[in-house]
Amino acid sequence: MNTFTKSIRQAFQGAFKAFQTFPASIGCALAFAVVTAIRIQLDWPQQEPLNFLFNCLHWAFAVGAVFSLAAITIAQSRYNNDRAFLISNILGAGAAALTFLLMYNFGGTDPAAEGYRYAMVSGLAAARAGAAVLVSFIVFIIFAGYPKEQSDFARSFFMAHKAFFIALLYGLVIMGGASGVAGAVQSLLYRGMSEKVYMYIGTLAGFLAYTIFAGYFPDFRKGQIDEKREIAQKQPRFMEILFGNIMVPIVLALTAVLLIWSGKTILSGMKVPFVRLSSIAASYAAGGIWLHIMVTHHEFRAARLYRRVYPYAALVILAFEAWALVIQLQKYGLKITEYSFTLIWIVAVAAVVLLLMKKYEAHRIIALITCFAAVFSVLPVFGYHALPVASQVSRLENLLISQGMLEGGKLAPSEEEPELSVREAITDAVIYIADSRDAKLPDWFDKDLRRHETFKEKLGFEQTWPEPETIDREWPGGYLGTSLYLKSSAVDISGYQWAVSPQEIYGKGNRELSVDGERGAYKIYWDMNPPNRIPLLRIMLGDQVILEKDMNDYIDRITAKYPPGGEGSHEADIEDMSVVLEAPEVTVMLVFDNIDINVNPQEDIISYWMNLRSLYMKER
């Protein structure tokens, strides 16, 4: 048997062995795949009400899979008995169940407050689950490096990378090969085959790749010497060349550039936009430490030079990055970018100091500090969602009090227009706070301040934006949507007494239009409800609301007939582009010019845009 065939056979043997070695982890991965298959089977109109449930299950099984990996490795490497193995698997399943219960009961958004049709997993809940996955995986790597006689953190760290890329390669080959066969079947035998077949293939390939990943690791049982460990931990010759002769010189060159920038900053001041600087610096700090761990056991001259130079150079560069951070905080206060960069900076400084003091023995401590930072970032008071908002609230309060616009916990419009810098700072803080989620806001703050008219009414001046340092617009990828436009045709409006143009409503600051009828004056409101724009029609007769209806039922009707997809716009008849609403006093027909429903699959966000052409109304 040649080497290539033997390696393939060993990979799949390891995958089957993973079911015995990590049963809870593989079980969670299988459940994850089953949930994915169910989601594939359901179209968006059927899936949308269940989206929150499915996302909770996905996160729960992801946490359970990685937590089980860590728990079983701890049990095997430290105890190696049946009782510890059983407990670790029960803990893994329990972690998945606990994550689901917490996320399902406490991790959802409020549809009414957020303007969504259904609850979604909040960003904070997803971040906490992500932190649990990260911490579990780091703990797995730490304990996979025991005993010290056979391994260490650097070797275990590389082994995890190696297992990942081998599993990724096999998964891509499986998916590509199976998709090719499916494509041949579709082209030659069954042209009506559903496109979902390819999604099922991708799901199965992902599950098999995970089993290959888990099965690649050696026997971690205490007292066992597995010859496979040495092979799994060993860096192939091409990897040594990649790290020592290519990546190390690149990072050393970047180090030189950043050191030159540091010297230039001393002479000419800080001129680089903070967003750009923070991204470069964060990449350098994280990537530099990662590479330092990877070349721990290399004896190449470049690798030895890098291990000596990097900690000192990083300290110098991090000192200047701290200067840039202080300037940014003085100018704009603490926001999510500054918060994230501060955490990375603290971890990086601690890491390079530890590398100088303890050399390669610092790796486990650095990993634990990283775990602490991940947990800290999602804590109730100090997390990314709370601390920046609290900082901006304090900043805004100081600005408003200085202008006499906040007294006794109540806002008051400015009697005189503040100077430009103050208006810019107030606008910047207001918009950041209004856009925040999962954070407690003071009673005096109204989230509608993000609207131009509310802002001017309550603060006494127009929103004034500071000049942006950079403009970074990007779509996270993937498009799924429904786009309809009204077919040119006549509209039967016989029997209706009034025709209301939407421009008449939009042109008024309060989005209100009055119509005089036999029963009295009707007030018509057409509210677009940003950010997700599920429109709401409200009609009042005097002071009484006689009709209040959102477009959820109409959206259900549209998505059932035109499920969101990747195609372009569709022409639709008047029957599809209109909706009739009735109340005891009036009958209303809404006619739309175009409707756009956009789905962001990565974030499970659905936004709606409904362009109203005319509103027709008659008394009953």
Identify the residue ranges that each predicted region occupies.
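Membrane-interface helix-loop-helix junctions at boundaries between adjacent transmembrane segments
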Residues: E48-P49, R78-S88, L102-I241
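Hydrophobic alpha-helical segments
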Residues: E240, G244, L254-I327
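Membrane-embedded alpha-helical segments of integral membrane proteins
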Residues: G177, R307-K358
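Extracytosolic and intramembrane catalytic regions of membrane-associated proteins
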Residues: E407-R620
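Internal/C-terminal transmembrane anchor helices
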Residues: E361-Y384
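N-terminal signal-anchor module of multipass membrane proteins
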Residues: M1-F100
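Membrane-helix interface and helix-disruption motif detector
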Residues: R39-W59, R78-A84, F106-G130, S187-Y200, ...
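Hydrophobic alpha-helical transmembrane segments in integral membrane proteins
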Residues: S377-Q403
